[in-house]
UniProtKB/Swiss-Prot annotation:
This is Putative membrane protein insertion efficiency factor. Belongs to the UPF0161 family. Could be involved in insertion of integral membrane proteins into the membrane. It comes from Thermoanaerobacter pseudethanolicus (strain ATCC 33223 / 39E). It holds the Pfam family YidD. Keywords: Cell membrane, Membrane.
């Protein structure tokens, strides 16, 4: 299941993300962060980390360097 989710994120990165203006305030991007978090911590914990990261990616947060720890 983990590999299916990562595959779907990679499809998003390849086909949908290039059509949208850059909007992620973080490095690595939220989608790349999600791949790394799910790969390292599994679908449950990595998924929660990904959701929390996406919720923080907004105009009220300065963003910056935020790697998966």
């Amino acid at each position: 299941m983990k590999n299916v989710v990562i595959f779907l994120i990679k499809l998003y990165q390849r086909y949908i993300s290039p059509m949208k203006p850059r909007s992620c305030r973080f490095y690595p991007t939220c989608s790349q962060y999600s791949i790394e978090a799910i790969s390292k911590y599994g679908l449950l914990k990595g998924g929660i980390m990904s959701i929390w990261r996406i919720l923080r990616c907004n105009p009220f947060n300065p963003g910056g360097y935020d790697p998966v720890k």
